[in-house]
A protein has these predicted regions:
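Positively charged, helix-rich recognition surfaces that bind polyanionic ligands
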Residues: 1-228
Length: 228
């Protein structure tokens, strides 16, 4: 599950061998446009009248942000339930301390945190678990193992892989998030000897902050060879 900059959420249903069963892009453009217009009015009001005049507008922006989080969380959990998912995997968000950045950036971070919390409550009611993985490089590394991605300057939802492949940035990140969860769950319960054997077969899984979907596929194949 990737809570991206371009789309409210990108969901991928994945098996432990890396097989992708379903995908879904969750987006509410109308609500985001409304929020964008409110933030624009706040900026103009602050320039013309100072900070004291935009408090009511800011409260309205926060309310719109919360409503967007509710809608997104509900859509995520409904999709997961419909696909028979057992676990919903998010990136771990570091929310300690003061969040810096523009109003838009602050609202985006608050919304991501709110979506995760609301999704967790909804998922538990439906018998699903929530898990979180390290977010480092999930978006910057291509899911196919080709290396760093280059964002499209004109369309930030798209990127180009090092091998020339064009792909959706948030979808690639969603694959990597699911893969890191399975890599951790596969390796963690194994005895040290078995884990070392698999890590020798697929060295990339030793460093979790750079693991991608392609590494899970290779790990699943190595596990099958060893089991055979």
């Amino acid at each position: 599950m990737d809570l991206g900059l371009n789309t409210d959420a990108v969901c991928t249903v994945m098996q432990s061998d890396g097989t992708v069963l379903a995908r879904k892009f969750i987006d509410f453009p109308g609500e985001k446009d409304r929020l964008k217009h409110v933030l624009g009015r706040i900026s103009r009001s602050q320039r013309e009248h100072g900070p004291s005049r935009y408090r009511r507008q800011w409260a309205y922006a926060v309310h719109l942000n919360e409503e967007l989080a509710k809608m997104t969380a509900r859509a995520i959990v409904d999709f997961a339930e419909g696909q028979g998912a057992d676990v919903i995997v998010f990136e771990h968000l570091e929310m300690k301390g003061r969040i810096r950045g523009s109003r838009k950036q602050k609202l985006h971070m608050w919304r991501k945190d709110d979506i995760q919390n609301r999704s967790e409550h909804l998922a538990h009611r439906k018998g699903m678990r929530i898990s979180r993985i390290c977010p480092w490089n999930t978006s910057s590394l291509a899911y196919d193992g080709s290396g760093k991605v280059k964002r499209d300057p004109d369309n930030h939802s798209l990127c180009t892989f090092a091998n020339g492949k064009r792909y959706n940035c948030d979808l690639s990140a969603s694959y990597n998030i699911g893969a890191r969860y399975y890599i951790r769950e596969i390796l963690k319960p194994l005895p040290a000897t078995a884990r070392s054997l698999l890590e020798a077969e697929v060295p990339a899984v030793k460093r979790r902050t750079s693991c991608v979907h392609a590494d899970l596929v290779q790990l699943a194949k190595a596990l099958g060879r060893i089991a055979a």
